[in-house]
C-alpha cells in the first residue's frame, strides 16, 4: 500500500534529478540501502576487519561521493 509524505520543494527537485527513470520508491530504497551499508562499513573500519585494499577502495569511493555532493547546487525556487 502506498503512503503519502510531504517534503520541501527543493528536496523534491533534487530527488527528481537523482532518480532518472527510477520510481521514487526505487530511489529511496537505494539511498536507504546505501546508508545502511555505509553504517556497516564504518563499523568494519572501526573494528579493523577491512584489508588494506578494501580501505583504499573505500577512500576512493568516499572521495567520489564528496566530489559528487560538492557539485550539487541548491535548486532555485
UniProtKB/Swiss-Prot annotation:
It comes from the Archaea. Keywords: Toxin-antitoxin system. The keyword Magnesium does not apply. The keyword Phosphoprotein does not apply. Belongs to the UPF0330 family. Possibly the antitoxin component of a type II toxin-antitoxin (TA) system. This is Putative antitoxin TK1752.
